[in-house]
Amino acid sequence: MPRSDPSPRERLAAIQGIRVLSRDDLRAAGLTTQRVTASVREGRLMRLRRGAYVSKEVPNEVVEAVRSGGRVTCLTLLRLIGVFVLERAEVHIHMPPHLSRSRHRRPDSAVLHWGECQREGQSHVVSLWDAVRQSVRCQTPRAAIATLDSVLHHRLLTSAEVESIFRTLPLRFQVLSPLIDSSAESGPETFMRLLLRSLGLSYETQVRLPGVGRVDFVVEGWLVIECDSREFHEGWEKQVDDRRRDLAAAELGYVTIRPLASDIFGRPNEVKEAVKAVVEAFGTRVGEQRAPQLRRSARETAVARRTGQRKGRFSGVMAAG
């Protein structure tokens, strides 16, 4: 069987397990100054800064942080372990408050976090708790909620630990806490959920439909919304599967739309207006009265197929008319 990708928890353990070695560590291991120099020249050791070495390949973000005299933190750590973050460009580095602000060379694009961390981490990376706490302050509200959803969904922190983070944040961030939902499986789902909430629409998340499988949202009881991203919907085979699922949902009386993740993030107002238009256009036809009858009729059809009885496939639709 092909090996599955490491989980966020496994990625976190791997990053935390990186050892940044000091000269004393190397001497204790029996390496003389000459052997250390030779090991660096031969590529067996990497010198990050004076008195800081690593013995194996490490992520570039860790190299940049340690060379700067700091540690990987915030969005960078979360991105490295597979937690959703919206912005991915800059390296986020936690700098010790006592360190001179001009002492070490730092990447021009780095985002520097000064101040004390509240939990113990490693010499090259802050604790996950501190990284999550910093990420709330470092993002827009919607992106922060999506990150928190992802952290909880992957069970990297408990709800109690997230609550403890909010107790340390200024009052203006407290409004975000009730909006967190660990059922969200991706950042686009979080953004879509908040969009639906802003429209005042009723919705359910991660709904399992007979013959269809699990869908991201069922809105107003009849509209299925699937948030399509390249990560999970790329390739013709996946496209075929998606379209067959849409047809199966149609037999149950559901209308399906598939907004792209790039549009959910980059054109939210247009997506919002499109969803609103679909609800207004179809709601009177397949909404409160007709959709339940369509779904009952489709379920009867599914039962008939399983039992070999071809009866009354469209009776529910005709009765609704």
Annotated model-derived regions:
Residues L152-G321:
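Surface segments flanking catalytic/ligand-binding clefts of nucleic-acid enzymes
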Residues M1-L169, L176, E280-G321:
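Short gly/ser-rich loop at a beta-strand->alpha-helix junction or flexible surface loop bordering the NTP-binding
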